[in-house]
Amino acid sequence: MIERTALYAGSFDPLTNGHLDVLKASLAVADIVYAAIGIHPGKKPLFSFEERVQLIEDATKAEFGRDGARIKVVAFDGLVIDAARKQGASIMIRGLRDGTDLDYEMQMAGMNETMAPELQTVFLPASPSVRTITATLVRQIASMGGDIRPFVPAAVAGALTAKFAK
């Protein structure tokens, strides 16, 4: 049987329950899912690459048990299609929260298909309970001392609280 490999790219700064929702759905589509953390030299993320790897690994293990081992965390810079090819992925996962996401992601999928016709983009709609969550809003709420526990895994909530307590 051919192993289906997918790549789900993002900054994951921080990992949210919305990201976990997409990762869970991805496990139904692929045997192995790479959570690919985009590294952009011009951006200063709140969490380092190493911290984001650890948070993703901790959260997926806690949330998915043994299935969490099917999620691998990697870094990439440059084009996501190159990251997918490097990992041997034939599927690129994209989460959709709303129509705005769909419009943008359809444009990206079209461009990616032109450059890499062997890769299939799969859109996964977010569950209603996580559709409003964005990492940007989570960071803003955390920076103002708000309760971010409904929006992120427990390990991420602790790490965010510690970051902003300094």
Swiss-Prot record:
Q: Which reaction is catalysed here?
A: (R)-4'-phosphopantetheine + ATP + H(+) = 3'-dephospho-CoA + diphosphate
Statement: the UniProt record of this protein carries the keyword Cell wall biogenesis/degradation: no
- One cellular-component annotation, GO: cytoplasm
Q: Which UniProt keywords apply?
A: ATP-binding, Coenzyme A biosynthesis, Cytoplasm, Magnesium, Nucleotide-binding, Nucleotidyltransferase, Transferase
GO molecular function terms attached to this record: ATP binding; pantetheine-phosphate adenylyltransferase activity
Q: In the Enzyme Commission scheme, what number(s) does this protein have?
A: 2.7.7.3
Gene Ontology biological process terms, A to Z: coenzyme A biosynthetic process
* InterPro entries according to UniProt: Cyt_trans-like, PPAT, Rossmann-like_a/b/a_fold
Q: In which pathway does it act?
A: Cofactor biosynthesis; coenzyme A biosynthesis; CoA from (R)-pantothenate: step 4/5
- The record places the site described as Transition state stabilizer at 19
By its UniProt entry, which SUPFAM superfamilies does this protein fall under? Nucleotidylyl transferase
Q: Does the keyword Acetylation apply?
A: no
Q: Which cellular compartments is it found in?
A: Cytoplasm
Principal location: cytoplasm
Binding of substrate: at which residues? Answer: 11, 43, 80, 94
Function, as annotated, reads: Reversibly transfers an adenylyl group from ATP to 4'-phosphopantetheine, yielding dephospho-CoA (dPCoA) and pyrophosphate.
Q: Which PANTHER family match?
A: PHOSPHOPANTETHEINE ADENYLYLTRANSFERASE
Q: Which family does it belong to?
A: Belongs to the bacterial CoaD family.
Q: What is this protein called?
A: Phosphopantetheine adenylyltransferase
